């Protein structure tokens, strides 16, 4: 159910209401990330909930749950703290005046419909210079395997959906399907984008076979007394043989062709001055290619400075609300 409040023919408040039917003709309402309005406007907040409660009574709704996207704090991932912005208490008091009950700043994901914490990558000039050493190393690992990052729209949907399905199977979770992603991209034609990490396994296999021949030749030419060197070369040969075996398994599915294969992906949506990474998927067989988050997120963040993402302040890596309320 869509709800809204107009003032002088201008929409000043809105909220998506999800309705869950319960036994005995009862139900519950849930407003994800809402309602959306100026929470400092106490009169507007009060009016919205008064009208919503009237609808709820007619619908035999036993309670209303909502988690407005209130920005309560910022801190570095290594410096957790429980500070709150001054406006937070003002918003809490406004909601409480509408008989809402604040359920607290829970840190357990099982207590909420959606998680509370959100990781942000802020837009920087020359972002490569501020990356952690660990991230730079992972990017180098991906570069050594010729992992490339491409971006597009509906033309990349098939590959992205396949990667999400693989993630669902691996994690035992239910995400969204191709039709849902298609709706997102169609509705955000100017703000939706799919990023894919790709690699050419055919070329990697050819390089591995050349390296195998070179190692075998070097082992044959190495003196038996040079045990340390032999051990190192044999370890490298075993690693190359393992890679070739894995490439063969991949060829059985994708065919042994000289082409790029999508191995990880992210679907992002631009809204206002932010960009939300909504969904991600990866082919586990390529995990040592390091295509997943660090290189992809870095490339997406670098992309914030292009014409596609104009004036973005940060990129969110999957989203979260700050507070949970119940109105009874």
Question: Predicted regions: what is each one?
Answer:
Residues 1-25, 71-73, 78, 86-88, ...:
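A conserved beta-strand-loop-helix scaffold within acyl/acetyltransferase catalytic domains
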């Amino acid at each position: 159910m869509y709800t809204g409040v107009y003032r002088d023919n201008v929409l000043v408040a809105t909220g998506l209401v999800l309705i869950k039917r319960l036994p005995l003709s009862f139900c519950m309402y849930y407003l994800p990330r809402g309602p959306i309005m100026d929470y400092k406007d106490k009169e507007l907040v009060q009016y919205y909930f008064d009208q919503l409660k009237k609808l709820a009574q007619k619908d035999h709704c036993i309670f209303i749950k909502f988690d407005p996207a209130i920005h309560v704090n910022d801190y570095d991932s290594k410096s957790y703290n429980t500070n709150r912005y001054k406006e937070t208490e003002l918003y809490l008091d406004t909601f409480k005046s509408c008989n809402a009950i604040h359920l607290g700043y829970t840190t357990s994901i099982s207590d909420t419909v959606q998680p509370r914490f959100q990781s942000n990558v802020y837009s920087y000039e020359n972002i490569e210079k501020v990356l952690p050493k660990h991230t730079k190393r992972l990017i180098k690992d991906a570069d050594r395997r010729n992992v490339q990052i491409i971006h597009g729209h509906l033309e990349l949907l098939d590959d992205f959906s396949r990667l999400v399905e693989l993630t669902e199977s691996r994690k035992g979770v239910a995400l969204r399907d191709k039709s849902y992603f298609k709706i997102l991209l169609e509705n955000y034609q100017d703000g939706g984008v799919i990023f894919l990490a790709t690699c050419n396994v055919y070329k990697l296999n050819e390089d591995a076979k050349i390296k195998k021949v070179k190692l075998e030749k070097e082992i044959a030419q190495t003196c038996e007394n040079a045990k340390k060197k032999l051990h190192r070369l044999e370890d490298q040969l075993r690693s190359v043989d393992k890679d070739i075996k894995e490439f063969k398994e991949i060829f059985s599915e994708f065919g042994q062709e000289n082409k790029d294969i999508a191995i990880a992906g992210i679907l992002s949506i631009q809204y206002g001055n932010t960009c939300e990474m909504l969904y991600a998927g990866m082919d586990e067989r390529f995990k040592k290619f390091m295509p997943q988050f660090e290189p992809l997120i870095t490339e997406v963040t670098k992309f914030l400075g292009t014409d596609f993402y104009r004036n973005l302040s940060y990129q969110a890596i999957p989203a979260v609300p700050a507070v949970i309320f119940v109105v009874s």
